[in-house]
């Protein structure tokens, strides 16, 4: 049986559209999103 698993390329601290485009160009499969919560 073939027990190989895929390798995922993760991008950490991707905080702008420019960075997302850059990382995708480098082979990014998924990215970490940093969310900010504000009190009103």
From Swiss-Prot:
Cite the post-translational modification comment: Contains 2 disulfide bonds.
Tissue expr: Expressed by the venom gland.
Binding-site residues for Mg(2+), renumbered to this chain: 32, 34
Keywords of the record: Cytolysis, Dermonecrotic toxin, Disulfide bond, Hemolysis, Lipid degradation, Lipid metabolism, Lyase, Magnesium, Metal-binding, Secreted, Toxin
Question: Which GO terms are recorded in the biological process aspect for this UniProt protein?
Answer: killing of cells of another organism; lipid catabolic process
Bound cofactor: record note? Binds 1 Mg(2+) ion per subunit.
According to its UniProt record, the EC number is: 4.6.1.-
Q: Which GO terms describe its cellular component?
A: extracellular region
Q: What does this protein do?
A: Dermonecrotic toxins cleave the phosphodiester linkage between the phosphate and headgroup of certain phospholipids (sphingolipid and lysolipid substrates), forming an alcohol (often choline) and a cyclic phosphate. This toxin acts on sphingomyelin (SM). It may also act on ceramide phosphoethanolamine (CPE), lysophosphatidylcholine (LPC) and lysophosphatidylethanolamine (LPE), but not on lysophosphatidylserine (LPS), and lysophosphatidylglycerol (LPG). It acts by transphosphatidylation, releasing exclusively cyclic phosphate products as second products.
Q: What is this protein called?
A: Dermonecrotic toxin LgSicTox-alphaI-1
């Amino acid at each position: 049986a073939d027990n190989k698993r895929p390798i995922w390329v993760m991008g950490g601290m991707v905080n702008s559209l420019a960075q997302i485009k850059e990382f995708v160009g480098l082979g990014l499969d998924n990215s970490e999103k940093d969310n900010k919560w504000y009190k009103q």
